[in-house]
C-alpha cells in the first residue's frame, strides 16, 4: 500500500485514475477529443520503450519516463528519491498482469559510430524521403505533413493525433539526444501511426544514425 500512497499522493491518480486506466478527473481535460491522453496502465501498448514494437517496456524504461517526464504533458518526478520512483513503478506494473511475464530484452542502444557530417546528414535526408516520413512531420519536419494537416492521423483509440514538430527539440517527448532519437526510430511508438523502423535498418544500423543526424539538423536551421 506504500507504493499506492506515493501514486495517489504525487498527483498521478488525478490523470491516470485510481485504477490506472487513464481516466483521472484531471486527465479527461488534458485533450478531451485528441491524443495524447494519460496512459492507460491496464493496456499493453506503451510508446516509450527500448523493447521491440508490441512488447512491454522494461523497468528502466519506466524509470526513465518518470524521472525525465514528458515535455508538455507530464512533469518530471525527479523530486522523488530513486527508491520512491521504483516503488511507483512497481505499483504501476500491478495494474497489468502481463508485467508478471518475462519482458523482452531491450534493443541494442550503441553510441553513435561516427560524428555528424554533411554526407551523413544528406543521406539521412534521403532516408527521410525514402521512408515517407514527410507525409506526417512534413518536408521540413515541422509537423505540417499532408496526413497531419488533413486530420488523418489517429491513435489506437481513434483519437486525433498531431505529427511532432521535429524542428523543436522541446517537443520530442521521448528525449532529444542522439540515442533517444535512435531508440525512437528503432522501436517506434506503439499505439500511434509512428512504426518501428528496426526491420528496415537491420544489418545497416549505421544508416539509422544518418537519419538521427538529419533529424537533429532540422532544429538547427
What is the role of each PLM region?
Residues 8-14, 19, 70-73, 84, ...:
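Short pre-active-site segment immediately N-terminal to redox-active cysteine/selenocysteine motifs
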Residues 21-31, 37-43, 99-117, 151, ...:
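His/Cys-centered metal/cofactor-coordination and adjacent catalytic loops
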Residues 30-78, 85-88, 92, 150-201, ...:
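Extracytoplasmic electron-transfer domains, predominantly the class I c-type cytochrome c fold
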Residues 17, 24-30, 51-53, 75-77, ...:
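Short, solvent-exposed loop/turn and secondary-structure capping segments
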Residues 1-8, 99-129, 170, 174-175, ...:
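Electrostatic cytochrome c docking/interface patches
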Residues 11, 16-19, 66-70, 78, ...:
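Sec/Tat-exported extracytoplasmic proteins
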Residues 1-18, 31, 116-142, 149-158:
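Sequence/structural segment immediately N-terminal to covalent heme-attachment motifs in c-type
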Residues 60, 77-123, 214:
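Extended surface/linker regions that mediate inter-domain or inter-protein docking
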